[in-house]
Amino acid sequence: MSGTLSSNNNGIDTKNDNENVSGNVNGNENQTENQNQNQNENENGTGNESSNEPPMKKIKTESGLDDSNPTFDFGITTDSSSQNIENSKSTPSEFTSDSTSAFDSAVKNSDGLSLPKSVAPSTDLKKDAIPTSNSGLALPKKNEKKGKTTGGKNVNKKESGKPGAKGSQSQTDASKMSDVLFSAGVDIREEEALLTSSVAASKTQSQPAAVNIPEHPPFLHPDQVAAFMKKASKEQNFNQNFAKQGEILQMISSSCENYMRDIITNTIVISRHRRKAVKVNSGRRSEVAIALKSIAIQQKKDEERRVKKRIALGLEKEDTENKIDSEETLHRASNATAGLRAGSKKQYGWLTSSTNKPLAATGKGAGNIAAAIAARGDTGLRFREAREEPGIVMRDLLNALENRRIGSHNIITKGYARIRD
């Protein structure tokens, strides 16, 4: 009996195994068919997001995975399923009667679904890298790119159509504005013309006018410089016409200008140092000058009274002509020597005038007294306050020329001869 029971149990187990294997094979075939259909639809571009087809139902397994793809490639085909069936028939089952009954009850309650067999995972990465399910993340498709780009173009076209509408609205607004201004009595064209004219006038005022500065004239005239240089060249025994050489004439003129400028600046500096400690417009004389002037006036009055007494007594006529001649000769001699030294022929009027003319009119009142005093040469004490002359005087120019060695010797001697104290 035990032998028959075990054989019956083995027969039941093999039947259940065959049913499970056939169910697994049918499920795997359905899965492969669904995968092939999904791949064909992806290649033909039927997987757009805007399609109205209902999403595929996910096959729920007892492992708790939501994806339709198995996590591992089990490599189940029809050939392998047949081999597994033959192996299951040939090999006896390792389960006991208790385990098989529990396993069979669990399989019967699983609604035709079975657990996957323990098969080693495949090493083919290309199959794993290509997702076949619609759920989860997926790579972009060709048709999706085209659809997006075309949609973007349509959006751009729509957006490009908007500014045209805005431009038309702005034109209508401008026309309405012009109508309103025209009805108010404002001429837009005249206002624009006035605005442009005012802007142009402001620009012309802001720009400075071009100033045409004339050329600086030469310090010395070129003809005069050429004549002087020709004369100097003849003295040096060579003849050259400098009239055709304007650069040389300009150089000589500029050098003379610099020479004179240096002399004048030195003269001005010396005159300023000379007048530095003296107040030009003081308006007040010193007490010493006032006392000397009063003494000179008193001496002149005393001399006039003495001359009157001598004329009244008849004592003034003795040896007057000899004294006048002797004084006149002395003054003429001194004037001649000074003229020879200075090289000038000018003579002062008070030395050349004759002194005999006032004596011819003697005996006629106060004129005789003045003539007698003039004949005696006693005109009293001349008063002169010590004041510095304003500006540049001869002393300043001579002081500036004394520092120069070339061409200034004769000028200095003539200048000192002409100074009048």
Swiss-Prot record:
Compositional bias (Low complexity): 19-53
Region feature (Disordered): 1-176
Main localization of the protein described in the UniProt heading: nucleus
Subcellular localization: Nucleus
Gene Ontology process terms (BP): transcription initiation at RNA polymerase II promoter
Residue span, Histone-fold domain: 226-294
Subunit structure: The 1.2 MDa TFIID complex is composed of TATA binding protein (TBP) and the 14 TBP-associated factors.
Function: Functions as a component of the DNA-binding general transcription factor complex TFIID. Binding of TFIID to a promoter (with or without TATA element) is the initial step in pre-initiation complex (PIC) formation. TFIID plays a key role in the regulation of gene expression by RNA polymerase II through different activities such as transcription activator interaction, core promoter recognition and selectivity, TFIIA and TFIIB interaction, chromatin modification (histone acetylation by TAF1), facilitation of DNA opening and initiation of transcription.
Protein name: Transcription initiation factor TFIID subunit 4
Species for this entry: Vanderwaltozyma polyspora (strain ATCC 22028 / DSM 70294 / BCRC 21397 / CBS 2163 / NBRC 10782 / NRRL Y-8283 / UCD 57-17) (Kluyveromyces polysporus)
Gene: TAF4
